[in-house]
Amino acid sequence: MSSSSSVPAYLGDEDLTQETRALISSLPKEKGWLVSEIYEFQGLWHTQAILQGILICQKRFEAKDSDIILVTNPKSGTTWLKALVFALLNRHKFPVSSSGNHPLLVTNPHLLVPFLEGVYYESPDFDFSSLPSPRLMNTHISHLSLPESVKSSSCKIVYCCRNPKDMFVSLWHFGKKLAPEETADYPIEKAVEAFCEGKFIGGPFWDHILEYWYASRENPNKVLFVTYEELKKQTEVEMKRIAEFLECGFIEEEEVREIVKLCSFESLSNLEVNKEGKLPNGIETKTFFRKGEIGGWRDTLSESLAEEIDRTIEEKFKGSGLKFSS
């Protein structure tokens, strides 16, 4: 990809190490959406830059028992989950009720909760040990590809899953905003086909979801599995469940309500920092806020495309016990 591309650096192929280039040359590849090519590594498909971030993360990240790692597929409630858990963990340091300058009012959630593989791609020598404890971070890395220290330590993982149809549509619109030139001539029918074949950025989506689903059932004290839909429908109830899992101590009903209000889509999306700001990688913060709805896929997907995704869901999740709200 040329340097004149409108695609952000972390979706491109600039500044790759020799090690990454050597590995990439040996990996299966497919034509991509957003980027010219994606590569299969440990079962999932990635851009070259994100692949490099994953490799560095696997080598250098050392988890602590007190760490909290938020995991999602792309466009599955990442921004919202970051805000909610940041506010929860910091409710004593930054009380929502007593301050008009809460960090979330002046800083985008993505700057408050670092994205592991993104940080490692942009700053390979970044020192995560300098972050205050408990360290709160997020990743899109599959369970299989997590650094060994994450798996072997007592750190906590909160995984948020979203209905794949809404996830796809959110990613589709995100990509069109992010890189209008690269996505202009890529029909949605082709994108749905690639999504359902698993040959899509971050895919196969079912493998990513099921790895964490089974991990949460095998080790419920290590991995908490929440769904975007339940988080939207009963935010206060789910927040209490997250707080209990993270062993945050007693939390007042009023505290929960205040956190939920502060972190609501309406609140966050209307803040100046989330309407006019930019992240260090050049992405406009407003790109992360579209509708935040359940069932918004109906406005974008035709009946036949929705059925195509539904058939994939039925086939891939059969027997897992995992059901999706629509």
Curated annotation (Swiss-Prot):
Disruption phenotype: Hypersensitivity to NaCl and ABA in seed germination, and to salicylic acid (SA) in seedling growth. One of its GO terms (biological process) is brassinosteroid metabolic process. InterPro entries: P-loop_NTPase, Sulfotransferase_dom. Its EC number is 2.8.2.-. Sulfotransferase that utilizes 3'-phospho-5'-adenylyl sulfate (PAPS) as sulfonate donor to catalyze the stereospecific sulfate conjugation of 24-epibrassinosteroids. Preferred substrates are 24-epicathasterone and 6-deoxo-24-epicathasterone. Low activity with 22-deoxy-24-epiteasterone. No activity with 24-epimers catasterone and brassinolide. Sulfonates salicylic acid. May be involved in detoxification. Enhances plant response to pathogen infection and contributes to long distance signaling in systemic acquired resistance (SAR). Dimer. This is Cytosolic sulfotransferase 12. It comes from Arabidopsis thaliana (Mouse-ear cress).
